Amino acid sequence: MKRAQQSARETKQEAKDASKAKSGLFASCSFSSLGLDTKLSDQLKERMGFEAPTLVQAQAIPVILSGRDVLVNAPTGTGKTIAYLAPLIHHLQGHSPKVDRSHGTFALVIVPTRELCLQVYETLEKLLHRFHWIVPGYVMGGEKKAKEKARLRKGISILIATPGRLLDHLKNTASFVHKNLRWVIFDEADSILELGYGKEIEQIIKLLGSGQNEQGEEDDIVPKGIQKQNLLLSATLNDKVNDLAKLSLDDPVMIGLDNTKLQQNLSIESPAAPDSDAEDMVIHVNKSANPLSEDYGIPSQLVQRYLRVPCGARLVALLSVLKNLFEREASQKVVVFFSTRDAVDFHYSLLSEFQWPPNSETEEEGTKELFLKCKTFRLHGSMEQEDRRSAFGTFKTEKQAVLLSTDVAARGLDFPKVRCIIQYDCPGEATEYVHRVGRTARIGEKGEALLFLQPIEIDYLKELKKHGASLTEYPLMKVLDKFPIPGNMPRIKKVLSLESHPWVISLQRALESLTYAEPKMKSLAKNAFVSWVRGYAAHKGELKSIFVVKKLHLGHVAKSFALREQPSLVGKSHHKETMKRKRDERQKGQQGKKRKKMSGTGNRSTQKT
């Protein structure tokens, strides 16, 4: 009987493994077959729920275990974090003599943002549950340096860090022990460089020294001559990433996307792999090769669509799409990307207060009926560190929520069960598109990505197509037709334009009424309008010919922030306030001078008498 039950379980497990392998994301092998310690493999399965490795993990883990430098280039959501953390823990848990925190730092993981720093740290903590003597830690901007120095003084075995704060400690924290350093990992390397940390990374590499442990002091537990291992992980490939690879990696193996452009610049190497379906992903990097092609991969299960929306109807279209998403499937999470922090703040306040129908209340006295019946969060770089941490952590645990964010959330963050990504503002570079859409359709799950485009921006689709992204049009008019028309507005049989749709007109009026009913909301709208126009004018390179600020109708831009005034009136109002403030300051200054003059005259007359 027991044998029959065990056989049934094994058959069920084999069927599950085969199903995952067929999905094209998971390998038909186990973590233990990759060479990982049994306890660590059990930890991955029992505590973290990973029954089988992804193809990227199946290919990367054995190569990293072998000690080779590695460049991992794979789509977001393919398990790259586990791919490098698991081999580190495997080596450290079996190290002789046993690793102690007094030995200092053995591994450095460098990440672009604070949120990703915390995310990697949380994953590391779970993996180390059975290996309590290996101490994880992090240092990042926004934290108190004194507390970080105290933690470094005690010792951190695996340290996750943002570039700026790491460089600070390398230069100024004498108690930061890293003489036993064996691994340096650059996670989301493309994002690190896009955020302008290139010079910091160069300094960090110089301060950490050459590829070998040359000190050989008596208390070193890493023998002299042991080669330091560097790993570089990136969702996209470009010239900057290639330059960093040449600077930091020694004769590396590349694991990642199999594309023709890439193979023209790289020579193929096929080391022994645990799974034949993963062998094609290994590439040997030739340091003398031409720069890597700027390319990226997008999960095949991701549905990509665009919305062609006139500027004046953008706000209504966004709210309508969000409402439709949550009415279609209540238990889901959505991330909306904006180009500026002011835009995030305005839309966050708007969604937190906007009622529909206007001034509606539920049966419970004083309870507002909000337009979106879900929690709203925001995330951007100007928020206090504790607020950022709270928003990031709470949104991850919510089942039904929307997150409004700048690109700070596009950098490798893993939000469970995000079903849709909305790019309300186009990314500054076409390559940034992949980071944003990578927040959904992770580890084989389905996802949807929506991109808002004005009619004058439609050529942006051609730019995306150059990089392998193909989008179909979203049926916005059909979605708008689903909503009931409030009041006595007649339903038109055939709506000629988006702006003339009864739902759009009624919703726009209600939004403008809210903005003008509250001075704070109006101020947020003005700030968002100004920063959005400035950001639009800042597009560079090939995108400058697509996003032309002179082609914008600024009155329609104002409308997209629920402002009734023409931009000239908004600007004039702001100009008047500025002139009035300067005039008041001049008057105060003149009054002060008069008082001093009168005081001085009185003193002189007293002296004369």
Curated annotation (Swiss-Prot):
Basic residues bias: where? Answer: 572-581
> Could you give one GO CC term from the UniProt record?
nucleus
State the Gene Ontology terms under molecular function: ATP binding; ATP hydrolysis activity; RNA binding; RNA helicase activity
Where is the Helicase ATP-binding domain positioned along the sequence?
61-255
Residue spans with biased composition (Polar residues)? Answer: 600-609
**Residues covered by region (Disordered):** 566-609
Residues forming the motif Q motif are: 29-58
Q: Which InterPro entries match?
A: DEAD/DEAH_box_helicase_dom, Helicase_ATP-bd, Helicase_C-like, P-loop_NTPase, RNA_helicase_DEAD_Q_motif, SPB4-like_CTE
**Segments carrying motif DEAD box:** 187-190
SUPFAM superfamilies found in the cross-reference section: P-loop containing nucleoside triphosphate hydrolases
Q: What GO terms describe the biological role, i.e. biological process, of this protein?
A: response to salt stress; ribosome biogenesis
Query: Which PROSITE patterns is this protein grouped with?
Result: HELICASE_ATP_BIND_1 (PS51192), HELICASE_CTER (PS51194), Q_MOTIF (PS51195)
What superkingdom heads the lineage?
Eukaryota
For this chain, the family text in UniProt reads: Belongs to the DEAD box helicase family. DDX31/DBP7 subfamily.
- Copy the domain comment: The Q motif is unique to and characteristic of the DEAD box family of RNA helicases and controls ATP binding and hydrolysis.
Q: What is this protein called?
A: DEAD-box ATP-dependent RNA helicase 17
Question: Which organism is the protein's source?
Answer: Arabidopsis thaliana (Mouse-ear cress)
Q: What gene makes this protein?
A: RH17
